[in-house]
Amino acid sequence: YCIYRYRETRAMTMGQFFEMRYSRGFRIYAASLQSLSGVVNYAIFPAVGARFLIYYCDLPLHVSFFGWVLPTFALVMALFLSAAVIVVSLGGQITIMVTDCILGILSYPLYAIVVIALLVKFSWSGDMAPTLLDRPAGESMLNPFDIDQLRNFNMFYIFVGLFSNVFNRMAWSGTQGYNAAAVNAHEQKMGAVLGTWRAGFQTMMILLLAVAGYTFLNNDDFAEGAAAARQELTWKAVNDVAADAKFDAVKTELRSYLDTGEMTPELATWSEGIHFEDKDENEPLRDMVKEGMAIQDKSAAQTFGAIHDQMRVPMALRHILPIGVTGVFCALCIFLLISTDTTYMHSWGSIIVQDIVLPVRGRAFTPQQQLRLLRLVIAGVAAFAFFFSLMFAQVDFILMFFAITGAIWLGGAGPCIVGGLYWRRGTSAGAFATLTAGSILAVGGIIAQKTWVEHIYPWLAETGRLGGVTTVVEGLSRPLEPYVEWRVLPDKFPINSQEIYFIAMLTGVVLYVIVSLLTGKEQFNMERMLHRGKYRRAGEEEVIHEELTWKTAYRKILGINSQYTRGDRILSWSVFLYSMLWGFGSFVVLTIWNSISPWPDSWWANWFKIYNLVVPGIIAVVSTVWFTIGGAWDLRRLFQRLETKEEDHLDDGRVVGHVSADDVGHVHEVEGD
């Protein structure tokens, strides 16, 4: 879905495809929003990664260097961003792919080590499951029929994710270099099919890290260690956020409490006055400190709460993992940090050069000029990410931040891509309307979330408009409760990031269809863009499609055609059967079963273990061996192909009359006949 057709266009970037399908103006406009959304979205990555290493490795917040006191946060970010820029500059997408492949092969056994260590430390039936089940009604972590009271991560959050998977397919371009990296469209599709089995122990490890951290912090058997981790985390987070002198009293009170265990009248007052929406009975120390900081600065209190919650599991893991495994996990995180930085910086830098600078310039660069400009822009992306991370204060969950910044582009990008690849009636006007509406809604959400506490809510209260706004906003969400529950409170914007994202997406789909139908005069030549029929390039294999009959229907469903080898067929069938029989089949059976006779929580705990640990564990053992051998073999094949590859300097991303520059001669020859 989308992957195959996109590769058939032979576009190197999404912007190039947009100019082929719509217009040059739309390519530049879309790339501007795309790069703005992507670069800002990525710009928080270095902050999260650096802060993780500081808390997990217990690094000091400041270090002295020749008499200068420097923030460790900035030094760690600078170190990893510099390493990523060097890797990207050495060889671009090829270097990134090779580096990622090698790091991936090296990481497989390390993932397994961390997984085994966590399973040895915590028993599923004795430690993890009882802790996960000990939740208030409507906030279950295991029973999907009992999550009505989860405000931010409930069924609506899942629904928006599913909706986005369909309507925003391929829209996110953080890894856009890989979308055009395969040797042909068939291999691009098979690479996506292989991805079903690729994750292996990585998925298990990520899941177990979260469950183990939660168990450690909330199970009474680990209460002593959890208390120490919480105190250490709170003290470090306060010093991280509250560097100004106005917070000295807060830090003094906290330090006294941590040293003596006695609560002063001031602390008692803060503890009694907690009024934040996200207060947690399991985190009284965090809430107490947050209340004390809010007296001086509500925004700083929000930042403290966000960082405290983000670093809670990393701090717990430092207390959980044994010596040796702690270092293994740290090495894994460094691998993943560099891998992510290289891929994202290359993607956003390429989009800026290829889809903004190149079409605005209107004429070709020399290969040397283009490569030099790419390196400079990629370094600029790294510099922006460094300073943004250094100065930006997080006020939302990380996933929520990704959702709202991504919505600047994703709010309207999906219909432009899916419609452009599959619908001949889509027009430039429809695409412009979709992207514009999605961007406005998303940016409006960002501004509202950022200014709600200090400006919008106080202004509404002072002008007497608060009552009317409360009635309208809360009334709009009432039919969708408990999944969508908007409450007008002083400390947080009532509509969360995922809800803003969905509103933008839905608006985009409706606008794309309506405006395209109103402005479309003729159908687009899809065969020319996809290089099909008479437009097929020399040397490319012609795909033979079987007629749809009862005997061929099953192959049609799987997309099997003349390009499939025996290995491809086996792989496709394995993924289809796993997804349909195990994945979707279990969903249908469990939904019907629980609608008739609801499972007890203990059954859900056992099912979670089987579905997320036992079966993936078996797959992980096989895929670790399979991808280690196969990855090494494919690396060898890649280098062999690169030795014989012929360069075409016309294939530089330019588009002439809806046709890529390197295809112009071929199209004229075909249409001239």
Language model segments and positions:
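Long, low-complexity, intrinsically disordered segments
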Residues: 667-673
